[in-house]
Amino acid sequence: MLRYPYFCRMYKECLSCWLESGIPNLGVWPNRIHTTAEKYREYEAREQTDQTQAQELHRSQDRDFETMAKLHIPVMVDEVVHCLSPQKGQIFLDMTFGSGGHTKAILQKESDIVLYALDRDPTAYALAEHLSELYPKQIRAMLGQFSQAEALLMKAGVQPGTFDGVLMDLGCSSMQLDTPERGFSLRKDGPLDMRMDGGRYPDMPTAADVVNALDQQALASILRTYGEEKHAKKIASAIVQARSIYPITRTQQLASIVAGAFPPSAIYTRKDLLQRSTHIATKTFQALRIFVNNELNELYTGLKTAQKFLRPGGRLVALSFHSLEDRIVKRFLLGISMTERFNLSVRQQVMKTSQLGSDHENTEEVSMRRAPLMWELIHKKVLSPQDQDVQDNPRGRSAKLRAAIKL
């Protein structure tokens, strides 16, 4: 059985990043998250320390690092490097190292720098470790989430106000999407996992835990809020009906359940920015991934950490890939804040309306507040990929780049 205190703690620690003024009524969270004994044994077998996992991967797959790095094509590389404008002797933080594409481009522009390479994914951390061997004076690899970055930096001796530039390349990497065992893609069958760092936290709920345990109203709220899915109720109903017959454990199984809620003609009617057909379950997968990995709250915490550790005049560059991320970045840079007293994210609202919520949780309504301006925008308008970039890397078609200088 899933260790319940972890689930409580994960949601109680969330900072609000859902910056809309309206908060949906989410219904009641189930009394506990159910997992089978088999799932528990699987979790127990996978328990390892963070560093050991990364080191073993490094030793066993050294010759495959170049191949892994090529799986992920960095987005808007020229724009990122231009906005960061690296100069000799400067110090940078890449908060989303991934396969290192942006970091390598920064080093090509100016090699006499120090760059801290952070990622929550042990696979990406192993790549950063490998790159640090090639650039021992420049690269400092770090493993952790945005919410852990401040502690990691302080432990490494980095003080607030140190960095000349910080990069955040948000969302899911191609390495994650293209590995069926990670459970991110609906096009490749695999276990319904979606955790970016599940090996580090065996008790962390998977996407399968979410779809098999939450009630219909909570599922619909997750799909509506994090996937901006207008058919959230219909999809949630289909999920609940399907799981009453058999557990939902595979990615393509979930994709088929979502598709089954619509007529065949509607499955590929949605179009992406390139006018290509997309599966009707795409937004469902996005919503579950964001929810499982706590991405929006992590983003908000990461932005605050970036601001704290940038020096005055330091540059922040953020690449987002859907409107939820971009909205948070935009409002943060514009100084539109919501004090913790008034913050109620979807997760916090779930806690408040369920038996998991504590008696002292704040129930006041959300109130938008504008904080003192802390940033000067480098570009007044958001930047998007050039046509050639989209042709070379269609996955980056929805990228939006915002950059600002700390005042």
From Swiss-Prot:
<dbReference type="GO" id="GO:0005739">
    <property type="term" value="C:mitochondrion"/>
</dbReference>
<dbReference type="Pfam" id="PF01795">
    <property type="entry name" value="Methyltransf_5"/>
</dbReference>
<comment type="similarity">
    <text>Belongs to the methyltransferase superfamily. RsmH family.</text>
</comment>
<dbReference type="InterPro" id="IPR023397">
    <property type="entry name" value="SAM-dep_MeTrfase_MraW_recog"/>
</dbReference>
<dbReference type="InterPro" id="IPR002903">
    <property type="entry name" value="RsmH"/>
</dbReference>
<dbReference type="InterPro" id="IPR029063">
    <property type="entry name" value="SAM-dependent_MTases_sf"/>
</dbReference>
<keyword id="KW-0496">Mitochondrion</keyword>
<feature type="binding site">
    <location>
        <position position="169"/>
    </location>
    <ligand>
        <name>S-adenosyl-L-methionine</name>
    </ligand>
</feature>
<feature type="binding site">
    <location>
        <position position="176"/>
    </location>
    <ligand>
        <name>S-adenosyl-L-methionine</name>
    </ligand>
</feature>
<dbReference type="GO" id="GO:0070475">
    <property type="term" value="P:rRNA base methylation"/>
</dbReference>
<keyword id="KW-0489">Methyltransferase</keyword>
<keyword id="KW-0597">Phosphoprotein</keyword>
<dbReference type="GO" id="GO:0071424">
    <property type="term" value="F:rRNA (cytosine-N4-)-methyltransferase activity"/>
</dbReference>
<feature type="binding site">
    <location>
        <begin position="100"/>
        <end position="102"/>
    </location>
    <ligand>
        <name>S-adenosyl-L-methionine</name>
    </ligand>
</feature>
<keyword id="KW-0808">Transferase</keyword>
<feature type="binding site">
    <location>
        <position position="146"/>
    </location>
    <ligand>
        <name>S-adenosyl-L-methionine</name>
    </ligand>
</feature>
<keyword id="KW-0949">S-adenosyl-L-methionine</keyword>
<feature type="binding site">
    <location>
        <position position="119"/>
    </location>
    <ligand>
        <name>S-adenosyl-L-methionine</name>
    </ligand>
</feature>
<protein>
    <recommendedName>
        <fullName>12S rRNA N(4)-cytidine methyltransferase METTL15</fullName>
        <ecNumber>2.1.1.-</ecNumber>
    </recommendedName>
</protein>
<feature type="modified residue" description="Phosphoserine">
    <location>
        <position position="358"/>
    </location>
</feature>
<comment type="function">
    <text>N4-methylcytidine (m4C) methyltransferase responsible for the methylation of position C839 in mitochondrial 12S rRNA. Involved in the stabilization of 12S rRNA folding, therefore facilitating the assembly of the mitochondrial small ribosomal subunits.</text>
</comment>
<keyword id="KW-0809">Transit peptide</keyword>
<dbReference type="GO" id="GO:0005759">
    <property type="term" value="C:mitochondrial matrix"/>
</dbReference>
